[in-house]
Amino acid sequence: MSNVWLLSWNPDKWNWKEYSAWCTGTKNKEKFTESWTCRSKKPSVGDEFFLIKQGERPRGIIGHGHIVRESYIAPHYDAERAKKGDWPNHVDAEFDWLLNYETEAFLDQDILKSLFPSQQWSPQGSGIRIREEVAPQLKKLWDNMKSSEGRIPK
């Protein structure tokens, strides 16, 4: 059984310029690949990931995809940190579905915490493993949410 990972994004810390376009593109079955910070070195090609939006509310899972390149070291996305030698682990993440948290339904973090209290939903770094007992239920919830296009109520 492959692992499922939780990658994170905080818009307050990184301006993801392609975000809106990618949200639209994935609805047209386009896939997009980005180098993503991942504190674990264990993700393998083919592993699934979910993307959780952090920072200011709303927070929650807004994306899904697969790892297409295993762990490698690359400069930090913050140029100043990279200049100081901060070169964290990365993976290449291929997004197959990305939601615009300002306009679309997504899996709210508070609901996730309530449904799956054993899982960490506010990681201090991107790239933690989703617990084996949580992953299948999370996938089902994600698929149901996508197909109904309705936000799970708070």
Segment roles from a protein language model:
Residues M1-V45, K113-S114, I130-E132, P136-K154:
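Compositionally biased, charged N-terminal/linker segments
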Residues K53-P58:
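Short, charged beta-turn/beta-strand-edge "cap" motif at the junction between a beta-strand
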Residues G60, H66-R129:
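Aromatic- and Lys/Arg-enriched surface recognition patch
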